[in-house]
Amino acid sequence: MSQPQDAPVKKKRPPMKEEDLKGAKNKLAHQVPIKSKTYQVMKECEQSGTMAPSVFSQNKTGGETAFDKPKAGPAKSVFG
């Protein structure tokens, strides 16, 4: 006959130590430069005094998207 399936056992988190919190706060306090492309663009726009491009803006140039533009030529066949 079939046996009842065991329910997954939930594990409890270990108790948080004050030393762990201090170490995490110290890591956050370090001045690590942000390497995000979005952050770079925002910083450049802020320094030049212009507004950063937005996907919600009505003034789109078309360069804001990461998708490839379709080529002007006719589609090529995969068979030849």
Curated annotation (Swiss-Prot):
The residue ranges flagged as biased composition, category Polar residues, are 50-62
Q: State where the protein is found.
A: Nucleus
* Name the record gives this protein: Musculoskeletal embryonic nuclear protein 1
Query: GO:BP terms for this protein?
Result: chondrocyte differentiation; chondrocyte proliferation; tissue regeneration
Q: Describe what happens without this gene.
A: Morpholino knockdown in embryonic craniofacial and dorsal axial tissues results in head and body axis defects with abnormal head chondrogenesis, small or absent eyes, reduced body axis length and tail kinks.
Q: Where is this motif: Nuclear localization signal?
A: 8-16
**Residue ranges of the region described as Disordered:** 1-27, 50-80
Question: Source gene?
Answer: mustn1
Q: Which UniProt keywords apply?
A: Chondrogenesis, Nucleus
UniProt record similarity statement? Belongs to the MUSTN1 family.
Q: Name one GO cellular component term.
A: nucleus
Pfam families found in the cross-reference section: Mustang
The organism named in the record is Xenopus laevis
Function, in words: Required for craniofacial chondrogenesis.
Q: List the disulfide bonds.
A: none
Give coiled-coil spans as residue ranges: none
